[in-house]
């Protein structure tokens, strides 16, 4: 659960920094 939360957070940060469309739901 913790890893999943961190993964989502990291993905969100990467999405903002890269300004790329989210491919993960």
Swiss-Prot record:
Key words of the record: Glycoprotein, Hemagglutinin, Lectin
Highest taxon listed in the record's lineage: Eukaryota
pH dependence text: Hemagglutinating activity is stable over the pH range 4.0-12.0 but decreases below pH 3.
Disulfide bonds, paired cysteine numbers: none
GO molecular function: carbohydrate binding
Keyword Glycoprotein annotated: yes
Temperature-activity profile: Hemagglutinating activity is stable when incubated over the range of 20-70 degrees Celsius for 60 minutes but is almost lost after incubation for 60 minutes at 80 degrees Celsius.
Modifications after synthesis and translation: N-glycosylated.
Function: D-galactose specific lectin. Binds in decreasing order of affinity: melibiose, N-acetyllactosamine, D-galacturonic acid, D-galactose, methyl-alpha-D-galactoside, D-galactose, methyl-alpha-D-galactopyranoside, methyl-beta-D-galactopyranoside and lactose. Binds also the glycoproteins globotriose, asialofetuin and mucin. Possesses glycan-dependent cytotoxic activity against Burkitt's lymphoma Raji cells and erythroleukemia K562 cells. Has calcium-independent hemagglutinating activity towards human erythrocytes.
Complex formation: Homodimer.
Protein name listed in UniProt: Galactose-binding lectin-2
Species, as recorded: Aplysia kurodai
Higher taxonomy: Eukaryota, Metazoa, Spiralia, Lophotrochozoa, Mollusca
């Amino acid at each position: 659960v913790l890893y999943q939360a961190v993964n989502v957070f990291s993905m969100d940060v990467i999405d903002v920094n890269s300004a790329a469309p989210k491919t993960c739901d």
